[in-house]
Amino acid sequence: MPADVKAAQSSAGDSRPGERDKALDLVLGQIERNFGKGSIMRLGDASRMRVETISTGALTLDLALGGGYPKGRVVEVYGPESSGKTTLTLHAIAEVQKRGGVAAFVDAEHALDPVYAASLGVDIENLLVSQPDTGEMALEIVDQLVRSAAVDIVVVDSVAALTPRAEIEGEMGDLAVGAQARLMSQAMRKITGNIGKSGCTVIFLNQLRLKIGVTYGNPETTTGGNALKFYASVRLDIRRIQTLKRGTEEYGIRAKVKVAKNKVAPPFRIAEFDILFGRGISTLGCVLDLAEETGVVTRKGAWYSYEGDNIGQGRDNTIGWLEQNPEAKDAIEVLVRQKLTEGSEVTANSMRPLAAAARSAAAKPSAKTADTDKKLVADGAA
């Protein structure tokens, strides 16, 4: 080995940690002077370790997301028509406004119902609303709102309605292949960095389309190309799985949300909750579901019981009891949150199987099973 190489390796090995630290501090200071404070930082800084969240309005979905929508990130919510996408985001807006935050709604579909939004708890007097003419206008408005650092949440409804200017100015039937995908790709490159710096959460609602000629696998895809899929930190797939009825009257739907992507918590979790027509997400229903799964409320047959007392026959009657007894409801919710904080087995990976297991465990055992259990207890005592 040449002597100069040996000398270089020796000098590199003999360099003192103090000198390396000085060199690192020097280059970090130079980078911050050139590009601004915060352009480079240590990942372990206390201000960067924990990602703050915004509540979704559904306790079960908050659990599945690891706390709620992450601040300073892009979120995509997609699903078929009438599945609860807009309702979900209006609840997020209401939660932000309750805490004194500022919310904006970019209504590209021109379909926002102020009366319905107000019924969900949205302060429509202070809600910023834009109904843009083109997709470029909508995304430029989003970018300016984000860069202001004065807005906490921006909702875009929806990506499918972000029509490029060239398509609007052209004639009906003209082909504009890939125009919307190029628009979204350029916008996401520009907006994402500003979103992280400002701490604003931007939620894009999206529609489903079917791929042509797909024989195997899922033929469903979202509009606007692939850029949003990559830039989104959280992607939620919401589906309508049941229609809630009282007799022949329909009063709501049962929604199921799958966390298709999550960069800030474990993905692929599933949450279910009720959406009541004209009232939005049933918070009492979420509390009852988690109370049953954590064992705070037990169910035998059709009866729900709390602290040994029957509180309602059937789910609807039990929810009515919780509504009439707010103190008991608050106590149950506190116990549920304590169990979840202590690391309960409920992880929201699949809410329905856990509930089924709890019901089967609470069911009355057969005589043969009871005899077996007695034998096992006797053997354990021996």
From Swiss-Prot:
Q: Which residues are connected by disulfide bridges in this protein?
A: none
One Gene Ontology cellular component annotation?
cytosol
Q: Which UniProt keywords apply?
A: ATP-binding, Cytoplasm, DNA damage, DNA recombination, DNA repair, DNA-binding, Nucleotide-binding, SOS response
What residue spans carry the Basic and acidic residues bias annotation? 370-382
One MF term in the entry's GO annotations: damaged DNA binding
The annotated region (Disordered) lies at 1-20, 360-382
Q: Name one GO biological process term.
A: DNA repair
Matching InterPro entries: AAA+_ATPase, DNA_recomb/repair_RecA, DNA_recomb/repair_RecA_CS, P-loop_NTPase, RecA-like_C, RecA-like_N, RecA_ATP-bd, RecA_C_sf
Q: Where does this protein have compositionally biased stretches of type Low complexity?
A: 360-369
Q: Pfam families from the entry?
A: RecA (PF00154), RecA_C (PF21096)
Q: State the source organism's domain of life.
A: Bacteria
- Main location class: cytoplasm
**Subcellular location, in the record's words?**
Cytoplasm
Q: Where, in this chain's numbering, is ATP bound? A: 79-86
Per its database record, what is this protein's job? Can catalyze the hydrolysis of ATP in the presence of single-stranded DNA, the ATP-dependent uptake of single-stranded DNA by duplex DNA, and the ATP-dependent hybridization of homologous single-stranded DNAs. It interacts with LexA causing its activation and leading to its autocatalytic cleavage.
Family from the record: Belongs to the RecA family.
* Alphabetical list of PANTHER family matching this protein: MITOCHONDRIAL DNA REPAIR PROTEIN RECA HOMOLOG-RELATED, RECA
Q: Under what name is this protein listed?
A: Protein RecA
Organism of derivation: Synechococcus sp. (strain CC9311)
